[in-house]
Design a protein with these regions (language model features):
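Non-globular, low-confidence helical/coil segments that flank catalytic cores
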Residues: 1-167
Length: 167
């Protein structure tokens, strides 16, 4: 199991577990999610699992800024990706891992709106299929979406595609 403080290096990337703490059995199963920060050069990825906004606020003291790519918490549900997290991290890219036509309508419209107002480029596996981000130390970030259909959603800016929620 992952525990806060674990760290390792591989293939030029530094992996750091930010959550959960050693004593975490009193937390809900969502709040025991593994939160992982991956750094390659100056680019940073943050995966927050299903942690709640309360845990997100605690994590803000641990995260190294800036964050290039954030995998949105809990598939983009309204229980995660709170305003404080969004405004502190201001990620360049946000990825929602959600099933196509999922019953919960993830990502939630409020979450999409928060990231849109923060200027983040947003991608969703529900619409874009498999999304691959490559972090290369000297080249920055490149992205490939298996099923890119920009006509199905609003643009965040001229070079970036936004997602829409069913809610």
């Amino acid at each position: 199991p992952c525990r806060r403080g674990q760290e390792w290096k591989r293939d030029g990337a530094v992996y750091r577990v930010l959550w959960p703490p050693q004593e975490s059995m009193e937390l809900s199963s969502n709040d025991r999610s593994c939160v992982l920060e991956v750094t390659v050069g100056s680019e940073r990825l943050l995966i927050t699992g299903d942690v709640s906004r309360e845990v997100e606020r605690r994590l803000l003291l641990e995260v190294t800024l800036p964050v290039t790519l954030l995998v949105a918490g809990h598939h983009g549900s309204q229980t995660s990706s709170g305003p404080q997290l969004v405004q502190t991290l201001l990620p360049q890219y946000v990825l929602y891992s959600a099933g196509r036509r999922n019953a919960y309508g993830h990502p939630h419209a409020d979450v999409v709106r928060r990231f849109r107002h923060a200027g983040s480029c947003q991608w969703s596996t529900a619409l874009d299929g498999a999304v691959t981000f490559h972090f290369v130390e000297s080249e920055g970030v490149t992205l490939h979406a298996a099923r890119r259909q920009p006509w199905r959603r609003d643009g965040v800016d001229g070079t970036c595609v936004g997602v829409e929620s069913r809610q």
